[in-house]
């Protein structure tokens, strides 16, 4: 089988993405795919950081652990869906979430959707992320 390729789809007749993501991602020749559930900000000891930034970092650490367990890394991510609890500080909250995502993703771009929601399954959770990765 020919090696896998991940390419960004950025149609010239569309505006540029609003942040550091791709409008779409095409995966050719994938041998393995990982679809995560919504990953939440619970640390191994069961605690949840109080701040959105702390929670976002825990979620990404958990996602990276899933990728490592699947013999994959950030460059295998093809799609991200992020849910953030809406608040009075939404603009700053979204900037925080995107800054952590950009730090983790570095120069890699994936298809990405960010959705604000009134609440998640537990009151202390402020963020939940699911992703798709391919190798």
Feature-to-residue mapping (PLM):
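Short, polar/acidic, helix-capping and beta-turn segments at strand->helix junctions
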Residues: 2-135
